[in-house]
Every structure is written in C-alpha cells, then in structure tokens.
C-alpha cells in the first residue's frame, strides 16, 4: 500500500510518525515538499519516505491520500487535481465538509 500526503505540516508529521512506528503495512509514503524542513526531517527519520514536488504525482502513485492543508489552500488546489475512484481520501481540512470535498474531487472515492 502506498500512502500520499498533500500538505506537510504538524498534522502530517504526527500521522506519519504514528504510521511508521506502528504495525501498519505500507510500501512507501509520499509527502509533498510544501514544508521542506518537515519533509526532509521525515525522510531522514523513516527510510520509506519519498518527497514529491508535484501533488498530482502523489495522487497518481498512491491508493490512500491524506489531505492536510489549510482550507484556503485546499479550495485552491483540489479543483485541479485528478483523483481515482479506487482511492481512499482522508481529509484533515477543517472547514471543508465531506459533501463539499466530494464535489471538489469529482470522483466517487471513499472519503473519510
């Protein structure tokens, strides 16, 4: 299983640390390079981390997508990203509801 994180802040860092220190099976974790300091630190700490500059490449590569950006950034970037129906999308975006997110990503994915 490949996991992808759009947004690289405290939430992403905490979730990835939890995943990497657990018994969850995964092949690779892709993180956006939005916050270089945090993404480089994660890559240094955990060997299965890859940093990606292009959010669409993260979505194209992963079956689980974690959205951890601010609401303003989410509204700006999500409309241009192309998700697949077989992906699971997990959103940490505080003010974007699941029905709103479904309209933005335009695909019948599982959204949590």
Question: Which role fits each region the language model picked out?
Answer:
Residues 1-53:
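NAD(P)+-binding Rossmann beta1-loop-alpha1 motif at the extreme N-terminus of oxidoreductases
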Residues 36-38, 46-49, 55-60, 64-112:
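Rossmann-like NAD(P)(H) cofactor-binding subdomain of soluble oxidoreductases
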């Amino acid at each position: 299983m490949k996991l992808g994180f759009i947004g690289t802040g405290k939430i992403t860092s905490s979730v990835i640390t939890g995943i990497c220190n657990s018994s969850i099976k995964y092949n690779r974790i892709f993180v956006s390079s939005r916050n270089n300091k945090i993404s480089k630190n994660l890559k240094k700490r955990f060997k299965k981390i890859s940093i990606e500059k292009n959010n669409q490449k993260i979505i194209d590569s992963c079956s689980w997508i974690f959205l951890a950006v601010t609401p303003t950034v989410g509204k700006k970037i999500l409309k241009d990203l192309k998700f697949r129906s077989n992906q699971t999308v997990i959103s940490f975006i505080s003010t974007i509801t699941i029905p709103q997110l479904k309209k933005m990503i335009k695909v019948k994915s599982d959204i949590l």
